[in-house]
Amino acid sequence: MELFTEADHLAEARYRKLLREQPGFVWRRFSDGEELMAYVFFPPGHRAEAAAPSVLFFHGGMWVGKSLGDFVPWALHLAQQGIAGIIPMFRTRGDYEVEPMDILEEGREAWAWVHGNAALLGLDPARITVAG
């Protein structure tokens, strides 16, 4: 029995396309050259001096999945409300030899990256929320 329908797969492909159309920033670079990106859904007309609130989304499931597209609808909706939606990549057990604590640490590092780059991104560092 297939858990996901063809429509589910089509939606995921569409969300991944929308994700790739957003501004992407390298938030983590490894010694082997691999990079992890963070995609930001900015509010329409966003300017760096705006200091917008933001939500940092963590995708995945059971530390295995790599479902970057899961939060695209939420990020799009929030951007229309004046809130930036940020979807960072991070390593999961499905693709890397990492443990759940490694993944949690990367989540903390992603939050620290957003907080440390808030002025550059036009975000308010006091209004960064985490969801996932």
Which stretches of residues belong to each language-model region?
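A fold-wide structural signal in alpha/beta-hydrolase
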Residues: S54, A79-M89
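Catalytic nucleophile-loop/oxyanion-hole region of alpha/beta-hydrolase
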Residues: K66-W74, P88-P125
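N-terminal cap/lid segment of alpha/beta-hydrolase-fold proteins
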Residues: E2-A50
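Phosphate-coordination loops involved in phosphoryl transfer and adenosine-cofactor binding
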Residues: A51-A52, P125-R127
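Gly/Ala-rich beta-loop-alpha elbow adjacent to hydrolase catalytic centers
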Residues: A131-G132
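Generic structural signal for alpha-helix termini and adjacent loop/cap motifs
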Residues: P44-G45, G61, N117-A118
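Short beta-strand element of the alpha/beta-hydrolase
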Residues: E49-M62
